[in-house]
Amino acid sequence: MEAFWESRTGHWAGGPAPGQFYRVPSTPSCLMDPMSAPARPITRTQNPMVTGTSVLGVKFDCGVVIAADMLGSYGSLARFRNISRIMRVNDSTMLGASGDYADFQYLKQVLGQMVIDEELFGDGHSYSPRAIHSWLTRAMYSRRSKMNPLWNTKVIGGYAGGESFLGYVDMLGVAYEAPSLATGYGAYLAQPLLREVLEKQPVLSQTEARELVERCMRVLYYRDARSYNRFQVATVTEKGVEIEGPLSAQTNWDIAHMISGFE
């Protein structure tokens, strides 16, 4: 009677029926003994959810400028419109990241703890921009080799020892330095504009670098469907790191009705 009542109330849904034998399903051996489970790589980050698009970086005569918009895209949906993709690492280094935002948040936590651990020594030394860049190349390549990469492309800017530094690291650990950098769609749209100016004038002032980056952010807003007209600009000089924003560029859509063929 109790079994009948429990079956009617759903307590034994999928369990034994009254008056019949119940065959207990077998448990996979890998659940009983974890050591017998086949060794497979952990792949938690193979499907990025919330992503960010381009990050731009330019050297100038006494520092570096980095810019990134504040949009987090959920697929093609402009879901989060007020997230920061630029972080201050220490007084001489800053970092911008495109790609999976969750992986960027994880990296922020790791780098933040590294800086705290270094400051605890109290010896007056801190990580240089080049040291942070070098560590990131090893960290990204290590994760890639474990088939569980951090799905980001990073731009590291800094100023130390009277020298400006601008470096690039992608999710595979590929790294290089350059006077101008762009990730994501900006590598196709903004980088040619940056190089065009730097070829004519290799050394920019801070004002010129700032205006160039803002111009490129405006072009990306016009042309990149995953960009947004709300961005941050970070500058590092011998005085330290300064992050400004959110900012918006002045736009003009008067010729929009003349563009056809992209419907």
UniProtKB/Swiss-Prot annotation:
Induction text: Up-regulated in cardiac hypertrophy and hypoxemia.
The name this protein goes by in its record: Proteasome subunit beta type-4
Propeptide part(s) removed at maturation, as residue ranges: 1-44
Residues found modified as Phosphoserine: S26
Purpose: Non-catalytic component of the 20S core proteasome complex involved in the proteolytic degradation of most intracellular proteins. This complex plays numerous essential roles within the cell by associating with different regulatory particles. Associated with two 19S regulatory particles, forms the 26S proteasome and thus participates in the ATP-dependent degradation of ubiquitinated proteins.
Originating species: Rattus norvegicus (Rat)
Phosphotyrosine carried by residues: Y101
Compartment(s) of residence: Cytoplasm; Nucleus
GO cellular component terms given for this protein: ciliary basal body; cytoplasm; cytosol; nucleus; proteasome complex; proteasome core complex; proteasome core complex, beta-subunit complex
Similarity field: Belongs to the peptidase T1B family.
Complex formation: The 26S proteasome consists of a 20S proteasome core and two 19S regulatory subunits. The 20S proteasome core is a barrel-shaped complex made of 28 subunits that are arranged in four stacked rings. The two outer rings are each formed by seven alpha subunits, and the two inner rings are formed by seven beta subunits. The proteolytic activity is exerted by three beta-subunits PSMB5, PSMB6 and PSMB7. Forms a ternary complex with SMAD1 and OAZ1 before PSMB4 is incorporated into the 20S proteasome. Interacts with PRPF19.
InterPro entries, sorted: Ntn_hydrolases_N, Proteasome_beta4, Proteasome_bsu_CS, Proteasome_sua/b, Proteasome_suB-type
Pfam family, one: Proteasome
SUPFAM superfamilies listed in its UniProt record: N-terminal nucleophile aminohydrolases (Ntn hydrolases)
Biological processes per GO annotation: negative regulation of inflammatory response to antigenic stimulus; proteasome-mediated ubiquitin-dependent protein catabolic process
Keywords linked to the UniProt accession: Acetylation, Cytoplasm, Nucleus, Phosphoprotein, Proteasome
